[in-house]
Amino acid sequence: MAQNFTKLNPQFENIIFEHDDNQMILNFGPQHPSSHGQLRLILELEGEKIIKATPEIGYLHRGCEKLGENMTYNEYMPTTDRLDYTSSTSNNYAYAHAVETLLNLEIPRRAQVIRTILLELNRMISHIFFISVHALDVGAMSVFLYAFKTREYGLDLMEDYCGARLTHNAIRIGGVPLDLPPNWLEGLKKFLGEMRECKKLIQGLLDKNRIWRMRLENVGVVTPKMAQSWGMSGIMLRGSGIAYDIRKEEPYELYKELDFDVPVGNYGDSYDRYCLYMLEIDESIRIIEQLIPMYAKTDTPIMAQNPHYISAPKEDIMTQNYALMQHFVLVAQGMRPPVGEVYAPTESPKGELGFFIHSEGEPYPHRLKIRAPSFYHIGALSDILVGQYLADAVTVIGSTNAVFGEVDR
């Protein structure tokens, strides 16, 4: 039987190959530098304009969800670092928050203060990282150098607290592993000053830069309807003009006690999204400045008290036989949450990050599902890129701030 060579399956199954001097099909990635070997876009072009974009993912798939169903609840925590690896503390917290909701644990106030500080510090580090590499993609190399210098100070603080700079593993189910080191808050105050100065410097380089604005304004426009239909969240959603932040709508930890604003865009373009990242850095500084005096007013416990699910403090394990046996059982066999299911959303630097956990009362989740914001934002490229010039594709992809560790799970 004669074969039909007008189609190539599966990637090109929806493309009709008809001769047109003005149209062509271009594979953007995975070798392209801006895709980091993790994204392939099949672009249909008419001249220099994109008329169709088909994202293809899966190049970084590691089976993170299935791993979670074959590990005990505590064993899985370090794996969450490898989702959005530019803001790993947010992943740690989102997973811990879901398990704690399932277990109905009460978290000590000091642990809540430390967690919220770490989350906002992590948000600033992630935002300044995005701004620096986005500027580098567009061609502003100086911003990359200045921003990375300031980011290093933030990573030093994370290293002083948990010993790691990238994959922090700084949160535990039930609290935090460590109290803040001596003089750590003084270093944090100094970092906030450094961040303010860095932000002013970057704004001086970019805000009124004619080339920067020409490359970003009216490029990659996301309308409110498009944002809602694709399930966008975070700055991708707020940039379109919709004021939705889970820290305000469904507050967790201490956010309901804190005074902060939710910046919202007007035009939904790449420049709006850049501006929102800068404004959110201000809000994170504002939040941390409210949390620092709260720390001194809290008591010393940093882990929840529940022998069925949480190990006793280390000093008790070393001196009390019952605490040692309970710790051995939790480590060797794992905790056994009650039968049920839970979905707990959080506001990560990229958007809504949530974990769905279905428990059958066993040491392993029966089903674990990760709702990662970058997955939805990459899918939306098939709408956002249509009508854009090929030269603007890198700008649009960069403005989504997608990390493929959480896209390919």
From Swiss-Prot:
Coiled-coil positions: none
SUPFAM superfamilies named in the record: HydB/Nqo4-like (SSF56762)
Membrane topology: Peripheral membrane protein
UniProt KW Membrane keyword: yes
UniProt keyword annotations, A-Z: Cell inner membrane, Cell membrane, Membrane, NAD, Quinone, Translocase, Transport, Ubiquinone
Key word Transport present: yes
Swiss-Prot/TrEMBL catalytic activity: a quinone + NADH + 5 H(+)(in) = a quinol + NAD(+) + 4 H(+)(out)
Broad class of the protein's primary localization: membrane
One Pfam family from the record: Complex1_49kDa
GO molecular function: NAD binding; NADH:ubiquinone reductase (non-electrogenic) activity; quinone binding
Location of this chain's protein in the cell: Cell inner membrane
UniProt EC number: 7.1.1.-
GO cellular component: plasma membrane
Quaternary assembly: NDH-1 is composed of 14 different subunits. Subunits NuoB, C, D, E, F, and G constitute the peripheral sector of the complex.
HAMAP family xrefs: NDH1_NuoD
Family note: Belongs to the complex I 49 kDa subunit family.
Function: NDH-1 shuttles electrons from NADH, via FMN and iron-sulfur (Fe-S) centers, to quinones in the respiratory chain. The immediate electron acceptor for the enzyme in this species is believed to be ubiquinone. Couples the redox reaction to proton translocation (for every two electrons transferred, four hydrogen ions are translocated across the cytoplasmic membrane), and thus conserves the redox energy in a proton gradient.
Protein name: NADH-quinone oxidoreductase subunit D
Organism: Helicobacter pylori (strain Shi470)
Lineage, opening ranks: Bacteria, Pseudomonadati, Campylobacterota, Epsilonproteobacteria, Campylobacterales
